[in-house]
Design a protein with these regions (language model features):
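Flexible glycine-/small-residue-rich
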Residues: 6-8, 37, 57, 74
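Short acidic/polar hinge/loop motifs at secondary-structure boundaries
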Residues: 9-37
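Extracytoplasmic loops and strand-loop junctions of Gram-negative outer membrane beta-barrel proteins
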Residues: 16, 35-36, 69-71, 123-129, ...
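A generic local structural motif
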Residues: 17-22, 84-86, 141-142
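Structural motif
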Residues: 22-25, 44, 144
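Periplasmic-side early beta-strands and strand-to-turn transitions of outer-membrane beta-barrels
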Residues: 91-170
Length: 170
């Protein structure tokens, strides 16, 4: 079994994944992805003998943020008339480290090119110009506040993810 973690906390066991069971992790602001294989995964979670995938982000800063950083991204896809944007800010306000992020994804059904589906001679089927139920929508907002010092750090964060996935072939 493989478990997915976000900053060391269990998000989901891969055994329970499927097209209609997405992983509740916002991929905006990821710093690194850690892979832990085999028995050493027991340090992070029990029952994960297949390994651990730990997604590390910067929602709770472990060191003081020395400058204000704004990031803005946009992506467009032609196969499904999709768009994806994200905006985030990290900085220091009144001695507290602050991280705010929002991302949105809106993907329509996948287009099927003309003549892409080949039928046996004599067969007749309805022709679709798209793959039904292949659409997806996501909105994710993250907020993190932390305080650091010679003694270490503490922080709190919140993530709100609203996701809707179509399940093709169902």
């Amino acid at each position: 079994r493989v478990k997915v973690l976000n900053n060391g906390l269990v998000v989901r066991d891969v055994a329970f994944m499927g097209a209609d069971h997405p992983i509740e992790v916002d991929i905006g602001g990821i710093q690194q992805i850690e892979i832990v294989k085999g028995p050493s995964s027991i340090l992070y979670s029990n029952g994960a003998i297949g390994g651990i995938v730990n997604i590390v982000d910067n929602t709770i800063a472990k060191e003081d943020v020395l400058e204000n950083i704004f990031n803005l991204g946009f992506e467009s896809q032609s196969v499904n008339d999709g768009d994806n944007y994200n905006i985030d800010y990290s900085g220091s306000v009144e001695g507290l480290n602050l991280f705010i992020s929002h991302s949105s994804k809106n993907l329509d059904n996948f287009d099927i090119p003309d003549e892409a589906v080949i039928h046996e001679p004599g067969e007749t089927h309805d022709e679709f110009s798209y793959l039904p139920n292949s659409d997806s929508k996501l909105a994710a907002t993250r907020l993190g506040i932390s305080k650091t010092g010679d003694w270490g750090y503490y922080g709190i964060s919140s993530v709100i993810i609203d996701q809707l996935n179509g399940v093709p072939f169902h």
